[in-house]
């Protein structure tokens, strides 16, 4: 039984989502005192449609930010979302990672019980 379960887990798809570029760079935005960068989220998971965007420091503590359209994104299967991330100039040295995390629908029957988290490191 254990061998069968291990075989099923090993043969399953390891598809997640993708966040590019891998190393985004913060540049001055059109808003004074604010830095911005552009990332693209690609959804490779058929069972997931929603992703949460976050910005963290080197210790994975949250950093204040704003993303275009809010921090929860709906991305269809094999679709892309272009996201502009804005960070205060005073927080640019703290901001280390831009991360996206797949969100499972609450109360719905899910094929997947696994949430994926992908981060890009800010240069």
List the model feature ranges, each with a label.
Residues 89-123:
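Terminal connector regions
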Residues 1-7:
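Sec-dependent signal peptide recognition
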